[in-house]
Amino acid sequence: MSRNNAYAGRIRRKSHIPGAAQVSRRIQGKVVEVSSTGDLITDIAPTAWNDVPRSTETRILVDQEHETVGLFGDDHQQPAMTLIAIADGDAPLKLHLVEDSAAIMLGVRAGASVEIRW
């Protein structure tokens, strides 16, 4: 057996480690309203996002073009011009651009798709 074939065999065995494959989950919705401050209000209710991890493995895609990482509360402490997803209280998920208008800066309107992946 050549050296390359032996190496390829090791790679193959490593890829069959039980539990190595991770199942991706997602929630799909859309922007239903733009607030007076430019936040993008979605139709994704707290019952849908309640069990979503609040870590960097969670990604939110808006209008198939803009992405942010993680879910935050209203007390987020993120720097200016950071796009964040706020999942807090009884309100639906909203996308917020710190100290600016997400709708204007991203060019997103009601009807745009929103997807949470983790």
Regions found by a protein language model. Give the residues of each.
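A conserved acidic, glycine/proline-rich C-terminal tail/linker
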Residues: 43-107
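Short small/polar-residue motifs
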Residues: 26-30, 79-84, 112
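Surface-exposed interaction regions enriched in Ser/Thr/Asp/Glu
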Residues: 112-118
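Anionic-ligand-binding alpha/beta catalytic cores of soluble enzymes and soluble regulatory domains
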Residues: 1-44, 48-54
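A generic structural motif
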Residues: 37, 90-92, 111
